[in-house]
Amino acid sequence: MGTEGTGTSVPHKKDWRENMGIANRKILHTDILIIGGGTAGCYAALTVREHSDYSIIIAEKANIKRSGCLAAGVNAINAYIVKGRKPEDYVDYCRKDADGIVREDLLLSMSQGLNRVTDKLEKLGLVILKDENGEYVARGNRNIKINGENMKPLLAKAVEELDNCQILNRVNITDYIVENNQILGAFGFSIEDNTAYEIRAKKVLCATGGAAGLYRPNNPGFSRHKMWYPPFNTGAGYAMGINAGAEMTTFEMRFIALRCKDTIAPTGTIAQGVGAKQVNSLGEVYENKYGLTTSQRVYGTVRENIEGRGPCYLRTEGITPEQDDSLKRAYLNMAPSQTLKWLESGKNPSEQNVEIEGTEPYIVGGHTASGYWVDNDRESTIRGLFAAGDVAGGCPQKYVTGAMVEGEIAAIAMVKQLDEGYLDPELDEETAFDRKIEEYDHFLDTDEKMFTYEAIEEAMQKVMDNYAGGISTHYQFNEKQLELAKEKIEQLQKLVWHISAHDMHELMFVYEVKERLTVALSVIAHLKDRKETRWHSFAENLDYPEKSKEWEIFVNSKMVDGELKMIHRDLVNLCQVPAGNMACLSLIHI
């Protein structure tokens, strides 16, 4: 018989949670550690194995089969050199979209590899749509159509078949191990059991994605994760680099996506697929009035609403029945809530325009230029630490294929450096590891803790929304607001140490909040440092509403003795920086 109705309890589970601490420790050694098993990380592993037999460990806090931005798949390759175009054309497009604040050397090396990695994806099994002549079906000047729902599983399967490659799924990396500005590995913990990891590595690739959840999102409560960027990308790689003293760039170039209202579904499929224009409530096409760059499209929508001509829409009324069907099928594959919204309304896209809105701001180096300051090999200012994908700065508009190219470039560079020889520095493993385990145990000790990670996260998002240019302020800010934002975020950082985690999964949430707070402070510092408005909405500074030639520079930062030190660097033109040579990037002032 069972215990039903007897009033007995199962105390062992409660006791396990309340007394939980790190019980096991594992020290692993590898030649190359890849942190993040998303698009860039997986492709880097494939490239390392293609060029060497060096041992690889991939640490992924989810599971590489469906992790990262590519988890649900995509319906187009958005960065591709179509017939009649050349890599330099893509560089030119990216430079114009970012109003000049880009690393042209990084853009060129990325652009030159876009078609190469696409070809490899097709060989792995990706279905790329072709016309009657066997040519790829283009969507605009830089895109080709695919059936890409299974793109990530294809990459993951190829990685899982590699020899001498250990995949640590459900392991959350929290800190780099750095001595004398050289990377030695990383610390982390398992999300599924109370095990802490020290992973010693000769080379490390950070491929952890960008940062979502810094600002209050479009949808509240239970639906807060219905957002443009993966809510599980919390800026871990940025935060680890910031705390370790790596130089970062262009965090003031936030990214705000223009999306279908409420569903936060992509708008490009409608704009490019059926040629839909942006119109206001009066039916006026307004997109040309403000400009067609990514930030200007958002800004125009914001201004039309502020000036009383909202809501704003993508004009789909009057499209053909065939286009109706095409749109519903396309969204069913990648954003089914939009198709369901049409079905629930009882109206096809041809019968009603699609309302649009901007998302909350994100920090994502795959769309803007924010991230690690790297050389052409994608090596950061910490020796042996590389960055690829959304964490790598200076190179916007990467999308899937660009992230793969950066993973490839970094992988080849790591192999080359290892081929040239590696001297293993001394490190007091036990002492450093002990300190990190004590930190984990601090949060796992639930006695007398005052706050939850959710409360701190909500407070952070409110601060950023109100004082650092969120949705509620139409993405606008002034210096006084940024000063208040900094003060309040620093207060929240102190409160983090009063959060309790009841299990290892909650411990991951605690570190996600810590990461976001670290990134938020960098965003605030960068927004305050750039005394102009170069990108409307992305960085709308009300104290400096105009663009200034004086600010045609990179705004960088580095943590020195616990304080962010701002650094200004010259723009980098095509082929200006040789691989592996950071010294030639001139310093303007510190």
How would you describe each model-predicted region?
Residues 32-58:
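N-terminal Rossmann-like FAD-binding beta1-loop-alpha1 element of flavoenzymes
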Residues 5-7, 11-32, 50-53, 586:
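Extreme N-terminal leader/targeting segments of oxidoreductases
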Residues 78-110:
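Glycine-rich active-site loop/strand segments that organize a redox cofactor
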Residues 419-503:
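Long, amphipathic alpha-helical stalk/connector segments used for oligomerization, subunit docking
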Residues 115, 122-174, 182, 250-399, ...:
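Mobile, glycine/GP-rich and aromatic-enriched active-site lid/loop segments adjacent to catalytic centers
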Residues 50-72:
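Glycine-rich FAD pyrophosphate-binding loop
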Residues 206-265, 400-413:
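Glycine-rich loop(s) and the adjacent beta-strand/alpha-helix scaffold that form part
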Residues 27-30, 193-203, 381:
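Core beta-strand elements of the Rossmann-like FAD/NAD(P) dinucleotide-binding domain
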